[in-house]
């Protein structure tokens, strides 16, 4: 599908649940969220029909997200069914890693190509402060399980926050000297709980690179790795993995955006950073034809803005939490 700005839209991010077994400070309130009624969340067969229709319109890549997607019962056979769909070339999953020791091998056998693991600190006490629950050792066990299952490339997503974990960027980069993993540093975005933290904790990509340079780390250029996302990759001399940067704010990558997002409640978002959502669940459950649902996907592509407006005044007045969007 080609949008109004000649971008090839071929990537669909699918949030299969709003539930999560962590409470990360930039993602959701400490008390959690009122859970969406199960009847409002799409059934797997509904997701599958929509993904198949999207594939018929040109979607080739699918990323499964949450919440935490591995908490949803039946996720492994769902991955297997998506992977075998006509037109789908790549299926990936974003997770906090806690359940990977249980699921990594099964996911690989089901056809999952790769995983992104969210991890914002390497320090046990700080991990508890950022996630509010959980143990960092469990995440590392999950990372090792993903590597053992050959879910390559294994990527670590690190949201950098000033005064919280910005003093760890060099430590994260050094992981690539010891492990065949790809560490991606992500700028904090003013979405949901991140909105209230943005002004005081936002760290630019250039500031992150400067912190690495202060500790003697020299980043060389790297052509990039499989994934089709917005990260720009570098490498340290002798490293087994890479260091990537995702600059949603300081140097937005909207000009090369290639994706749509489908929420757990069946809302199609043309842009992660837009308030616009197009309802798919209602027509789907009212018996809409595949042709009608395909036209809704086309409508979403036509509605994609050229770029986000997260820094505009009033952006955060009606926030949608990251865990609800499936960012």
Curated annotation (Swiss-Prot):
Residues annotated for S-adenosyl-L-methionine binding in this entry: 26, 67, 118, 189
Cofactor(s) for this UniProt protein: [4Fe-4S] cluster
Q: Does the keyword Transmembrane apply?
A: no
Q: Name one GO biological process term.
A: Mo-molybdopterin cofactor biosynthetic process
Q: Superkingdom of the source?
A: Bacteria
Alphabetically sorted, this entry's keywords are:
4Fe-4S, GTP-binding, Iron, Iron-sulfur, Lyase, Metal-binding, Molybdenum cofactor biosynthesis, Nucleotide-binding, S-adenosyl-L-methionine
Positions of [4Fe-4S] cluster 2 binding: 254, 257, 271
Q: What class of enzyme is it?
A: lyase
The UniProt entry, under CDD domains, shows:
Radical_SAM (cd01335), Twitch_MoaA (cd21117)
The protein's matches in InterPro entries, at most eight in alphabetical order, are given as: Aldolase_TIM, Elp3/MiaA/NifB-like_rSAM, MoaA, MoaA_NifB_PqqE_Fe-S-bd_CS, MoaA_twitch, MoCo_biosynth_MoaA/MoaC, rSAM
> Where, by residue number, does GTP bind?
13, 63, 94, 155, 259-261
- Span of domain Radical SAM core: 4-226
* Cofactor notes: Binds 2 [4Fe-4S] clusters. Binds 1 [4Fe-4S] cluster coordinated with 3 cysteines and an exchangeable S-adenosyl-L-methionine and 1 [4Fe-4S] cluster coordinated with 3 cysteines and the GTP-derived substrate.
Question: Per the record, what are the reactions this protein catalyses?
Answer: GTP + AH2 + S-adenosyl-L-methionine = (8S)-3',8-cyclo-7,8-dihydroguanosine 5'-triphosphate + 5'-deoxyadenosine + L-methionine + A + H(+)
According to its UniProt record, the EC number is: 4.1.99.22
Q: Which GO terms describe its molecular function?
A: 4 iron, 4 sulfur cluster binding; cyclic pyranopterin monophosphate synthase activity; GTP 3',8'-cyclase activity; GTP binding; metal ion binding; S-adenosyl-L-methionine binding
Hey, what's the signal peptide range on this chain?
A: none
Subunit note: Monomer and homodimer.
Q: In which family does this protein belong, per the annotation?
A: Belongs to the radical SAM superfamily. MoaA family.
Chain's role: Catalyzes the cyclization of GTP to (8S)-3',8-cyclo-7,8-dihydroguanosine 5'-triphosphate.
Q: What is this protein's record name? A: GTP 3',8-cyclase
Q: Which organism is it from?
A: Heliobacterium modesticaldum (strain ATCC 51547 / Ice1)
């Amino acid at each position: 599908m080609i949008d109004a700005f000649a971008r090839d839209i071929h990537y669909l991010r699918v949030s299969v649940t709003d539930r999560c077994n962590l409470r990360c400070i930039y993602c959701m309130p400490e008390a959690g969220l009122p859970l969406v009624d199960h009847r409002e969340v799409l059934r797997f067969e509904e997701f599958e029909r929509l993904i198949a229709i999207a594939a018929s319109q040109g979607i080739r890549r699918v990323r499964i997200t949450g919440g935490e997607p591995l908490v949803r019962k039946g996720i492994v056979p769902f991955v297997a069914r998506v992977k075998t769909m006509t037109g789908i070339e790549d299926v990936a999953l974003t997770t906090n890693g806690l359940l990977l020791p249980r699921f990594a091998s099964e996911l690989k056998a089901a056809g999952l190509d790769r995983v992104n693991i969210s991890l914002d600190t390497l320090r046990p006490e700080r991990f508890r402060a950022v996630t509010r629950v959980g143990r960092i050792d469990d995440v590392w066990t999950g990372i090792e399980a993903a590597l053992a299952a050959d879910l390559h490339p294994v990527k670590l997503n690190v949201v950098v926050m000033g005064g919280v974990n910005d003093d760890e960027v060099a430590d994260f980069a050094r992981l690539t000297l010891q492990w065949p993993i790809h560490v991606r540093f992500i700028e904090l975005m003013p979405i949901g709980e991140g909105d209230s933290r943005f002004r005081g904790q936002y760290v630019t990509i250039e500031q992150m690179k400067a912190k690495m340079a202060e500790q003697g780390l020299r980043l060389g250029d790297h052509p990039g790795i499989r994934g089709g996302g917005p990260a720009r990759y570098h490498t340290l001399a002798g490293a087994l993995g890479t260091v990537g940067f995702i600059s949603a704010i300081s140097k937005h990558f909207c000009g090369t955006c290639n994706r749509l997002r489908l929420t757990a409640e069946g809302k199609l978002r043309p842009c992660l950073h837009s308030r616009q959502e197009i309802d798919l669940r209602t027509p789907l459950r009212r018996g809409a034809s595949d042709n009608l649902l395909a036209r809704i996907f086309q409508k979403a592509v036509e509605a994609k803005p050229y770029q986000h407006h997260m820094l505009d005044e009033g952006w955060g007045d009606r926030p949608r939490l990251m865990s609800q969007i499936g960012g």
